[in-house]
Swiss-Prot record:
Pfam families: CAT_RBD (PF03123), PRD (PF00874). Disulfide bonds: none annotated. The gene is lacT. The keyword Repeat applies. GO terms for molecular function: RNA binding. SUPFAM superfamilies: PTS-regulatory domain, PRD, SacY-like RNA-binding domain. GO terms for biological process: positive regulation of DNA-templated transcription. Belongs to the transcriptional antiterminator BglG family. It comes from the Bacteria. Residues 66-170, 172-284 form the PRD domain. It comes from Lacticaseibacillus casei. This is Transcription antiterminator LacT.
Length: 292
């Protein structure tokens, strides 16, 4: 039976499982008037999110420093849907970036400052990711009580496209490589007068997190390879020429100075990050950019 390790609120708790590590459980009133060590009857648990390894536990505690538990469990539920219903393989950092995105969007929505962003639309090339994102809107509405516009599907889908891959367990970063890569990228950004600011801070930080996991993927021999659809490359280059230019500079310098074997797919991921950083409007519209 699950035993309480930590109570987050009346409805959410961290539990110890007999021989299966830990999990976050959610259910109406499951932790009400309970204490650490108390047993939670399994019939009261509505959702369970397993923490498979130390990285999963570290991600959870990192998130809880700044993000409400209801947003965190909503994110876990969305990723659970992606993995179980749609068989999507994603890297662990999506727990951080997606939680952060949902929370920031939630705060802006509540404050009346939410604005739709101009991001690429790839629902034809990535139907599963967009299906997850569409379902995510329903989960967010149910759990958090906010109804984002349909255009938010593009933002949510990009998180799954960007985090495509498969973790083999623990994340081990080479600190010297991480510092070199981060410095190189920041120097290119500064040449184009792009620095971290209040308005772009969230997108800037997500890009830096992507770079950390990029290093880890490049150091693995058995990296899970994801090939970007060719039409996406053409679409990005035509629609976002400035983002393409900056992203290509970053890609070329990393490849020349640090990692010659880097996949061409990374150039496209960089474009997506840069486009959000500078909020570049599309140079031309295509039928696939119509609302879903």
């Amino acid at each position: 039976m699950p035993k309480i390790a930590q109570i987050f609120n009346n409805n959410v708790a961290l539990v110890d499982l007999d021989n299966r590590g830990q999990a976050v459980v959610r259910g109406r009133g499951i932790a009400f008037q309970k204490r650490r060590g108390d047993v939670i009857p399994t019939k009261q648990i509505e959702k369970i999110f397993y923490l498979a390894n130390e990285t999963s536990r570290q991600n959870l505690y990192f998130l809880l420093k700044n993000i409400p538990i209801d947003v965190v469990t909503t994110t876990y539920e969305i990723i659970d849907v992606a993995q179980k219903q749609y068989r999507l393989k994603v890297l662990d950092y999506i727990y951080i970036t997606l939680s952060d995105h949902i929370y920031e969007a939630y705060k802006r929505y509540q404050a009346g400052t939410y604005q739709e962003t101009m991001v690429p639309d790839f629902h034809i090339q990535y139907p599963a990711e967009y299906a997850v994102a569409k379902q995510a809107l329903q989960i967010i509405a149910t759990n958090l009580g906010v109804q984002f516009p349909q255009s938010e599907i593009k933002n949510l889908a990009l998180h799954f496209i960007n985090a495509s891959g498969e973790d083999d367990g623990e994340q081990v970063f080479g600190k010297s490589n991480e510092a070199s890569l981060s410095q190189l990228v920041q120097e290119v950004l500064k040449r184009h007068h792009i620095t971290r600011s209040h308005s772009n801070g969230n997108y800037y930080d997500r890009f830096m997190i992507h770079l950390q996991y990029l290093i880890d993927r490049l150091q693995r021999v058995d990296t899970y390879a994801v090939t970007i659809v060719p039409e996406v490359a053409t679409e990005l280059k035509q629609n976002y020429p400035q983002s393409y230019k900056i992203a290509s500079e970053i890609f070329d310098e990393i490849k020349d100075q640090l990692y010659r074997s880097m996949s061409e797919d990374e150039r496209l991921y960089f474009i997506i990050h840069i486009q959000r950083l500078i909020n570049e409007a599309p140079a031309q519209n295509h039928s696939q950019n119509d609302s879903l």
